[in-house]
């Protein structure tokens, strides 16, 4: 248990991975049964089968499912916009990832770029089923896929979800010269040009 009363991820999962994201064909392994990637990964049947993936969560409105019979598909029809209600899907997607894992399968969660929507859903899953706080879940996913950057609206929904699960939040929204961002972005935002999706 951490000092916040949450368990931490198992030590075997906490060790840095020596496999680069490029070696995984554009996907990152988040846990033994959860992968995160961009949309093009979902079209690579050989890669999916090689990783033991049995379920594909498609968190886009713009990419159709391939509907190959050997995979189960879950569609989360959302745009990568701050007002999109991704929080409505946190429990459903987390429960599905957990169910697939218990059946010894693996899940790929993808969006178009593997940066915002899919990362948000993976973070929510870690909070719910690995009992880690939002900050730990974000740092864990970012260590596995450094390009992740959930949009501000998704952060607000993750903060609300953490409060619902644990009664407090470990990430706060703060004012910066570029607008309101989660405090985990504050340091890096000092070096960024303005970007609408911060």
Swiss-Prot record:
First-tier enzyme category under EC: hydrolase
Sequence ranges assigned to domain Tyrosine-protein phosphatase in this UniProt record: 26-167
Active site as annotated: 111
SUPFAM superfamilies per the UniProt record, alphabetical: (Phosphotyrosine protein) phosphatases II
Alphabetical list of SMART domains matching this protein: DSPc (SM00195)
Signal peptide: none
PROSITE patterns: TYR_PHOSPHATASE_1, TYR_PHOSPHATASE_2, TYR_PHOSPHATASE_DUAL
Its EC number(s): 3.1.3.16, 3.1.3.48
Catalytic activity, as annotated: O-phospho-L-tyrosyl-[protein] + H2O = L-tyrosyl-[protein] + phosphate; O-phospho-L-seryl-[protein] + H2O = L-seryl-[protein] + phosphate; O-phospho-L-threonyl-[protein] + H2O = L-threonyl-[protein] + phosphate
Record key words, sorted: Hydrolase, Protein phosphatase
Entry keyword Membrane: no
Top-level division of the source organism's lineage: Eukaryota
Record carries keyword Repressor: no
Subunit field text: Interacts with CD28.
Family, per entry: Belongs to the protein-tyrosine phosphatase family. Non-receptor class dual specificity subfamily.
Protein name per its UniProtKB record: Dual specificity protein phosphatase 14
Organism: Bos taurus (Bovine)
């Amino acid at each position: 248990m951490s000092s916040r009363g949450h368990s931490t991820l198992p030590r075997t999962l906490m060790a840095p991975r020596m496999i680069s994201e490029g070696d995984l064909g554009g996907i990152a392994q988040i846990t033994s049964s959860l992968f995160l990637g961009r949309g093009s990964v979902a079209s690579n049947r050989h890669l999916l089968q090689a990783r033991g993936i049995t379920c594909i969560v498609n968190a886009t409105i713009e990419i159709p499912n391939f509907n190959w019979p050997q995979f189960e598909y879950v569609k989360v029809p959302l745009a990568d916009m701050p007002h999109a209600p991704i929080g409505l899907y946190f429990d459903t997607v987390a429960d599905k990832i957990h169910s697939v894992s218990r059946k010894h399968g693996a899940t790929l969660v993808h969006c178009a770029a593997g940066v915002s929507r899919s990362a948000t859903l993976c973070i929510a899953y870690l909070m719910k089923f690995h009992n880690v706080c939002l900050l730990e879940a974000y740092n864990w996913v970012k260590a596995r896929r450094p390009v992740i950057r959930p949009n501000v609206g998704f952060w607000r929904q993750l903060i609300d979800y953490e409060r619902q699960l644990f009664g407090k939040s470990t990430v706060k929204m703060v004012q910066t010269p570029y607008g309101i961002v989660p405090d985990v972005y504050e340091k890096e935002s000092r070096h960024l040009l303005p970007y609408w999706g911060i």
